A protein has these predicted regions:
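Sec-dependent N-terminal signal peptides
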Residues: 2-17
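Generic N-terminal leader/processing signal
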Residues: 1-2, 135
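Flexible, low-complexity junctional segments that flank or bridge functional domains
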Residues: 21-305, 315-318, 375, 412-425, ...
């Protein structure tokens, strides 16, 4: 059986699971106990908990988050101030229990305006009954500046990568916590005039409806199909890949279909869109690139490493598929699996994956027969994550074309990955997902990388271009790419 190695990005903070409890039963002491358990799990089980911050700094950050929770022991505050915030690991996730979260949603009034962030500015991203123009800039909510609100939003990213691809409207709702169902905003109109407005909160069903009718993102079809392509103009083909979590044979058949079409129609340009691609199977990365490589053979280089190969924290460890707690045999089998596939390095305290780890790994990867040799533009954003960041990193290393959009959410040279462990906290029933290894891209395997950047785009969208596209209800990055290709033809 072919073994698949998956690199998943768990970007959603609030992913429902199943249980039978209500929020009113969770006491302050229960929140604090679960916080302490979660912190212990992370510090003992994460493959490199002090990658970005010293032990002293991590301890101080945890103390600060715990004090914030102690001051306001509420359901949503438990997640906003979760211990996972201190590590700088976008793969580590805290997920809610379905019934608890449903109770919370039913008791919460949501911000009624859809928003979108570009270059640190928050813009109105949909029609509304208050006649606030699409493209108006949001300045304050309930006397709190947008800058302060953005700082409070937990970022799903590696290291200190600046993330602005977040659902600001949702977090305004979570952070507001007022009981009178109102939001007082200050905003700037398109002609520069500052105004105030009083808004009525809406229930979750209404919020969900509004979010589905926002202007951006435009490409809703690809979000449904995962892989989707079509002609932009007689010279240019658009290929959107929203996930790499496909069986390799299925993925190849889809790519073969589109690249055969590209060859038959003799397109000169290709726009590849991996915005909002949260990752998947790392073996699919060179597969996609093989259809556009300029070289007959290109280097596909990645390596797994971890400082923790054993299960050090076994309490509350569960099988996420069955919700069953791990037995001693489960733990023993898991430890044996890792010990057989990771060898201690001669220097440092890392264990690196050996040849037994990945029998699908091909370092010198051949170009596909249907390869495209024209010009390529790659679209990325902060939600280009995990394995998708490896694709962007490979694309940039090979100098295959221009990258348009925003910095990726994972580091360009490494991230965490693979063989996730899942824990269920005893009181809040929160599940924690922790990766067991790191993965290093393109021959980067430095033990001590205190800072990282994502893959940096060659072209970012300035506010004027963004606003014009938003008002016209056009995809800003895609429109910029088409114009870029036309200018350089």
């Amino acid at each position: 059986m072919i073994k698949k190695i998956f690199v998943f990005s768990l970007l959603s903070l609030f992913t429902p699971l199943f249980s039978q409890y209500s929020i009113s039963e969770i006491s302050k002491d229960s929140y604090l106990k679960d916080f302490d358990v979660a912190a212990a799990i992370l510090l003992n089980q994460h493959p490199n908990p002090y990658r970005f911050h010293s032990k002293e700094t991590v301890t101080k950050k945890l103390d600060s988050l715990r004090k914030a929770l102690e001051k306001d022991p509420s359901y949503i505050n438990f997640y906003i101030n979760s211990p996972g915030r201190v590590l700088g690991d976008g793969h580590t996730s805290f997920s809610t229990d379905a019934n608890y979260y449903e109770d919370y949603l039913n008791s919460t009034y949501f911000f009624p305006l859809m928003t979108y962030v570009n270059n640190g500015n928050v813009y109105i991203n949909g029609d509304n009954k208050y006649n606030i123009e699409i493209g108006s800039k949001l300045l304050e909510v309930n006397n709190k500046s947008i800058a302060d609100i953005l700082k409070q939003i937990p970022a799903s990213a590696d290291g200190n990568i600046k993330v602005e691809d977040v659902d600001v409207s949702q977090y305004i709702s979570f952070l507001n916590r007022n009981k009178d169902n109102t939001f007082t905003i200050k905003y700037q109109t398109l002609n520069g005039e500052q105004k105030k407005a009083n808004l009525e909160g809406i229930k979750f069903t209404g919020f969900n409806y509004e979010s589905k009718h926002a202007v951006l993102p435009i490409d809703a079809t690809s979000e449904i199909y995962g892989i989707f392509g079509y002609e932009l103009n007689p010279d240019t083909f658009y290929l959107s890949v929203k996930s790499f979590s496909y069986d390799e044979s299925f993925f190849y058949e889809k790519l073969k279909k589109y690249f055969q079409q590209i060859k038959n129609k003799k397109y000169k340009n290709l726009v590849v869109d991996i915005r909002n691609n949260s990752g998947g199977s790392v073996t699919n990365i060179p597969l996609l690139y093989s259809f556009m490589s300029k070289e007959k053979i290109f280097t596909n280089s990645y390596k797994y490493g971890s400082k923790v190969i054993d299960i050090n924290y076994s309490d509350y460890l569960i099988d996420p598929q069955t919700d069953r707690y791990y037995s001693e045999k489960d733990i023993r089998d898991s430890n044996n699996f890792m010990r057989q596939r990771f060898d201690k390095s001669e220097k440092g305290d890392y264990y690196f994956g050996n040849n037994r780890l990945d029998d699908t790994y091909i370092k010198n990867y051949p170009r596909d027969g249907l390869f495209f040799d024209g010009r390529v533009v790659l679209l990325t954003n902060n939600r280009t994550f995990s394995a998708a960041t490896y694709f962007a990193s490979l694309f940039k290393k090979e100098k295959r074309g221009d990258i348009v959009g925003k910095e990726t959410g994972s580091c360009s040279n490494f991230t965490t990955a693979a063989w996730f462990l899942t824990y269920k906290l005893p009181n809040t029933k929160t599940t924690i997902s922790i990766p067991r290894t790191e993965i290093f891209f393109n021959n980067n395997e430095n033990d001590n990388i205190p800072n990282c950047t994502g893959v940096i785009p060659d072209h970012k969208i300035d506010d004027n271009f963004f606003l014009n596209a938003l008002k016209e209800k056009i995809d800003p990055e895609l429109q910029y790419s088409v114009e870029l290709l036309s200018r350089t033809s």
